[in-house]
Swiss-Prot record:
Role noted for this protein: Plays a central role in 2-thiolation of mcm(5)S(2)U at tRNA wobble positions of tRNA(Lys), tRNA(Glu) and tRNA(Gln). Directly binds tRNAs and probably acts by catalyzing adenylation of tRNAs, an intermediate required for 2-thiolation. It is unclear whether it acts as a sulfurtransferase that transfers sulfur from thiocarboxylated URM1 onto the uridine of tRNAs at wobble position. Prior mcm(5) tRNA modification by the elongator complex is required for 2-thiolation. May also be involved in protein urmylation.
Organism: Scheffersomyces stipitis (strain ATCC 58785 / CBS 6054 / NBRC 10063 / NRRL Y-11545) (Yeast)
Protein name per Swiss-Prot or TrEMBL: Cytoplasmic tRNA 2-thiolation protein 1
Entry EC number(s): 2.7.7.-
Keywords assigned: Cytoplasm, RNA-binding, Transferase, tRNA processing, tRNA-binding
Record bears the keyword tRNA processing: yes
Gene name for this UniProt entry: NCS6
PANTHER family, sorted: ATPASES OF THE PP SUPERFAMILY-RELATED, CYTOPLASMIC TRNA 2-THIOLATION PROTEIN 1
Lineage, broadest ranks: Eukaryota, Fungi, Dikarya, Ascomycota, Saccharomycotina
Gene Ontology BP terms: protein urmylation; tRNA thio-modification; tRNA wobble position uridine thiolation; tRNA wobble uridine modification
Main location (coarse class): cytoplasm
Length: 376
């Protein structure tokens, strides 16, 4: 968790907007000196402009706020409630929280979400990994290893948000992803050479394949430091402990790089987002295949577990949007959705561990060799 505090300015300095009250902070985005009231106004107005420019909402929309109890989602709930009343958006706002099953972290943060429910007078729905997948993140990490935690959690959490929204009859979920998160994602995809994801890194509205539920980011252009300052000055109730498994995430590498760049050039966060928005990748070259390759049938049709725990299903024809996963029945553009692929890998690995531990010495080596291809 990055600790952020307002930089002290001279007592004699006046707010650069109202020129009447003393400035209490410098905006990290442009170093503008502002008083509290002007900061609130600028902060909220910029988010309103983002919402209007991107046409995120329509009157009467029922919107689920992805609530974790952290600073981003807490400020998002507070600001959306304020803007909804000020500009008469006509939205019906609901808090949607995901319980991943991380002891000592999520149980405490959910207590904060429940307080937010009362403070903001919004309905709250909690969806748990245990109920949806029969796994908790603690169990997944014990089986797949801590380095894979974010891979699993990202896929499962996105589907859990979709499922929670569908349960509530909602087709729009807003999340607290901020400008820092967007810039980090661009850097991560550049560092990994992930051109497929790089093209979509800065989309303000996203949607899972086959799902009618869209996810949007009203904080796309809002600096994390300003979100923390807003929460601090408004005295909002939020949970500040970092996820237990976050230190192992590759995102941390991009975050440290971004901090170094920001110390040299404060505008680099917006610059990176701008670059991501306007990046045009060269068109992919079409592969020329011979009739032999085209007609060649794949003889090995068994499911294979990949390094990240997902299951490869061979070269099957992809489903169209609107079809459903053959395993869980949820909307998917493939025969088996990503969540079920990951869970299948976990079940296979757990079966291997169980056999290794319980099989008698005679025959154990044969069974182990047979199932070895299923391990991560």
């Amino acid at each position: 968790m990055t600790e952020i505090s307002a930089k002290k300015v001279k007592v004699s300095a006046l707010c650069e907007l109202c020129h009447a009250r003393k400035a209490v902070m410098k905006r990290p985005k442009n170093l503008q000196k502002l008083c509290k009231d002007c900061f609130y106004k600028v902060f909220e107005t910029e988010i309103h402009n983002t919402i209007v420019d991107a046409k995120l909402f329509s009157p009467g929309d029922k919107v689920a706020i992805g609530a974790s109890g952290g600073k981003d989602s807490t400020v998002l709930a507070s600001v959306l409630k304020t803007l909804n009343e000020r500009y008469d958006y006509g939205l019906i706002l609901v808090l949607l929280s995901i319980d991943e099953g991380i002891k000592g972290y999520r149980d405490d943060s959910l207590a904060t979400v429940k307080r937010n429910q009362v403070q903001y007078e919004m309905p709250l729905e909690i969806i748990s990994y245990r109920d949806l997948y029969n796994w908790t993140m603690d169990e997944i990490v014990s089986c797949a290893g801590i380095r894979s935690s974010c891979t699993y959690c990202g896929v499962l959490r996105r589907q859990a948000l979709d499922r929670g929204a569908a349960k509530l009859g909602i087709n729009h979920v807003v999340t607290g992803h901020n400008a820092d998160d967007m810039a980090e994602t661009v850097l991560m995809n550049l560092l990994r050479g992930d051109t497929a994801r790089l093209e979509k890194s800065c989309a303000i509205i996203t949607q899972s394949a086959g799902s009618p539920i869209k996810r949007s980011k009203p904080f796309k252009y809002t600096y994390q430091k300003e979100i923390v300052l807003y929460a601090h000055y408004k005295k909002l109730d939020y949970f500040s402990t970092e996820c237990t498994y976050a230190p192992e995430a590759f995102r941390g590498t991009a975050r440290e790089l971004l901090k170094s760049l920001e110390s040299i050039r404060p505008s680099c966060i917006m610059d990176i987002i701008y670059s991501g928005e306007h990046l045009v990748l060269a068109p992919k070259k079409k592969k020329i295949t011979t009739s032999y390759k085209t007609n060649k049938k794949k003889t090995h049709t068994e499911n294979e577990v990949n390094a990240d725990g997902s299951v490869s299903l061979g070269r099957k024809k992809q489903f169209e949007d609107g079809n459903r996963c053959e395993k869980c029945g949820y909307l998917s553009s493939n025969r088996i959705c990503k969540a079920c692929m990951l869970l299948a890998g976990l079940e296979m690995n757990r079966a291997k561990v169980s056999i290794d531990n319980n099989t008698a010495v005679d025959g154990a080596a044969v069974l182990t060799r047979t199932l070895e291809q299923l391990s991560f």
